Amino acid sequence: MLSPKRTKYRKPHRGNRKGQALRGNKISFGDFALQALEPGWITSRQIEAGRRAMSRYAKRGGKLWIRMFPDRSITARAAETRMGAGKGAPDYWVCIVKPGKILYELAGVPETIARASMRIAAYKMPVKTKFLVRDEYVAPQ
């Protein structure tokens, strides 16, 4: 699973979920993409589950790009722990996703396979998504 090698701060603030994605909101590498329509946190486990589902459905064909990275640690306390005694230890990693962010890109497969594999990956995401096709994409004859 994805996680940063090192971070500036071990325990960041939670932050807010306002606004649109200003960067990472256009198809840059592939011909097809999965785009987030609402804000949320996507964990490293969910990113990996989506990647596995897409690569298995495409039978390892084509090329897949993951356009998000879990760079924010989420802390948790043990169950039935008394209040106080500081903030909990980092438990898992998340990627902060805003509406418009491209999550995955895919190239080298037909549109039907890309659409179906992205649908399977979308079921594993905690946010609503939509399927995008690059503007200058021309289907192979």
Curated annotation (Swiss-Prot):
Q: Which SUPFAM superfamilies match?
A: Ribosomal protein L16p/L10e
User: Quick one: signal sequence residues?
Assistant: none
Family to which the UniProt record says this protein belongs: Belongs to the universal ribosomal protein uL16 family.
Q: Give the originating organism.
A: Ostreococcus tauri
Matches recorded under Gene3D superfamilies: Ribosomal protein L10e/L16
Alphabetically list the UniProt keywords. Chloroplast, Plastid, Ribonucleoprotein, Ribosomal protein
Entries under PANTHER family matching the protein: 50S/60S RIBOSOMAL PROTEIN L16 (PTHR12220), LARGE RIBOSOMAL SUBUNIT PROTEIN UL16M (PTHR12220:SF13)
Indicate, by first and last residue, each region the UniProt record lists as having compositional bias (Basic residues).
1-17
The alphabetized list of GO BP terms reads: mitochondrial translation
Disulfide bond residue pairs? none
User: What is one term from the GO cellular component aspect held by the record?
Assistant: mitochondrial large ribosomal subunit
Give the lineage. Answer: Eukaryota, Viridiplantae, Chlorophyta, Mamiellophyceae, Mamiellales
Molecular function, one GO term: structural constituent of ribosome
- Keyword Secreted recorded: no
Q: Where is this region: Disordered?
A: 1-21
This chain belongs to the protein called Large ribosomal subunit protein uL16c
Question: Which NCBIfam families does the annotation name?
Answer: rplP_bact
Q: Where in the cell is it found?
A: Plastid, Chloroplast
What PROSITE patterns does the record point to? RIBOSOMAL_L16_1, RIBOSOMAL_L16_2
Known partners and oligomeric status: Part of the 50S ribosomal subunit.
